[in-house]
Amino acid sequence: MFGSVGLNGMSLTDQLYLAQANVIREIAEDAPCVVVGRCADHVLRDFPNKFDFFIHGSIEDRIKRIQSCGDYEIEGKTPQAALEKMDKQRSTYYNYYTGKVWGKCDHYDMCINAGRLGVEHSVDIILEYVNRLKK
């Protein structure tokens, strides 16, 4: 997909994806874990006890969040431009490796607007959801 071709004819990006997928599966087989991104919903699609959440927010809420975490500037871009570029990269990566559409609600157990709820309430809702389904 991306990048130069490695020794086995696969791109370095494809090799990295496969290596990450293997590590994610190994960790998930050993113990409960939380994986953020890396197409983990797809990588772990055959794991029966997994939960998939998509955390999102408006661009304005996300800018406030990153600015509250300190100085945030990528390659001299504004926070909005950096977020838009990052979203485009995430979408392209996810869509390519999963064959699904990044952020589409029917791929997840739950989509949460953390911009409206805040981080703490979002975590509370996720924990409540997981705990209820584990019973």
What feature does the model see in each segment?
Residues 37-42:
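Short, polar loop motifs at secondary-structure junctions
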Residues 1-32:
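ATP-dependent small-molecule kinase phosphotransfer cores
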Residues 21, 119-127:
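Short, amphipathic alpha-helical "lid/cap" segments that border enzyme active or binding sites
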Residues 27, 43-47:
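RNA pseudouridine synthases
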Residues 46-69, 76-85:
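Conserved phosphate-donor/acceptor-positioning beta-strand/loop module used by diverse small-molecule
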Residues 75-120:
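Small-molecule kinase domains that catalyze NTP-dependent phosphoryl transfer to phosphate-bearing small molecules
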Residues 128-135:
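Short, charged, intrinsically disordered terminal tails
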